[in-house]
Regions:
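Sec-dependent bacterial lipoprotein signal peptides
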Residues: 1-14
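Sec-type signal peptide cleavage vicinity
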Residues: 13-329
């Protein structure tokens, strides 16, 4: 009897051990792994940029949300080397293709489903580059099977993360009326520029479900001292079908108002249609001079925001003069 009990115990132990080894083997074999990049030319992984022309990449503690088919979104966190989850995600099979939908950031966004992802709020920006990543929103998607890359889902190359919103850069020259001025307020006006947006992977577009916010304002209180200064804004833009001509965009024009102080006098200068139309996924750059109370565009460009884009840049030519109404208070 003693021998029988010992044999039975050994068999149970062996079975349990075999089951654990099988589970570990399956876990190792069928676990989903993630690799994510921003743009085709990026070799790193955050949204980390010194300026708008630098390479963008992910940094430590950044997080993304990833849907597998119609499952709920899973949070993946970048540890500086790789992407990890609190709980492993497994492939449902080895041979069938599955679609992965990813968005950044997971924090600051809320995803009820892949058709209704609440994007970061845009109405608390201060116009500086340093915190611009808090307001950005990027997406990526890819359809593949386990056998495509031994379980790895690489959001890179043609499948890399892309910017969904528009980046507006306004560079104010430290000359003319602004040489020794203090910029008190900058106001942007347009259709739904900072209204809360919701992204859908089904339509690959943003929907606005709230009353459009027509005005956005910052109060930099910036002293020029003959130096140029740039302000950055992430805003809602019109759909981008590959044609980055802003004249093709409707209902996303931007009016600019600058309130400033010079020699103890308060001025307001305005430029209607600074941009005739903002495009999703594009950077709109405008260099301006305030001269004799007029906002004059001295140059700029419109280009794709995502690194490695194949869109041709549009150069904005400078103007001789732009008659506007200038008010002194």
């Amino acid at each position: 009897r003693s021998l029988y009990v010992s044999l039975l115990t050994f068999m149970c132990f062996s079975a349990c051990q075999g089951s654990e080894e099988l589970e570990q083997s399956q876990e190792k074999e069928y676990t989903v792994s993630i690799m994510a990049r921003i743009g085709k030319t990026v070799s790193g992984a955050r949204y980390l940029q010194d300026h708008e022309n630098a390479i963008a990449s992910f940094s430590k503690t950044d997080d993304i949300g990833v849907f597998m088919d119609n499952d709920s979104a899973v949070r993946w966190i970048f540890d500086g080397t790789s992407w990890t989850t609190e709980k492993s995600v497994f492939w449902k099979d080895k041979n069938q293709e599955h679609t992965f939908y990813a968005y950044y950031p997971h924090s600051g966004s809320k995803a009820e489903s892949k058709e209704n992802i609440k994007m970061p709020s845009l109405d608390s920006q201060n116009g500086t580059w340093e915190n611009i990543d808090q307001y950005d929103f990027l997406v990526a998607s890819r359809k593949l099977s386990y056998d495509t890359d031994l379980g790895n889902v690489a959001f890179s190359g043609d499948y890399s993360f892309k910017h969904v919103l528009s980046l507006l850069k306004i560079n104010i020259k430290g000359e003319g009326d602004m040489a020794q001025a203090v910029i008190d307020k900058i106001r942007l006006e347009g259709n739904g520029l900072t209204t809360q947006g919701y992204y859908s992977f089904e339509t690959n577009s943003i929907t606005i479900s709230e009353t459009p916010k027509e005005t956005f304002q910052i109060t930099p209180s910036h002293t020029m001292n003959n130096q140029d200064v740039s302000f950055y804004f992430i805003l809602n833009g019109g759909e981008n079908d590959g044609n980055i001509d802003p004249k093709a965009v409707k209902n996303h024009s931007v009016n600019l108002t600058i309130e400033y102080t010079r020699n103890n006098k308060y001025y307001i200068t305005r430029r209607d249609d600074l941009s005739p139309g903002l495009l999703s996924g594009c950077i709109h750059k405008y260099n301006i001079v305030v001269k004799d109370g007029n906002v004059i565009i001295t140059g700029g460009s419109i280009s794709g925001w995502t690194p490695g884009n194949e869109e041709e840049d549009i150069v904005i030519n400078g103007e001789e003069i732009n008659p506007q109404t200038n008010n002194m208070l």
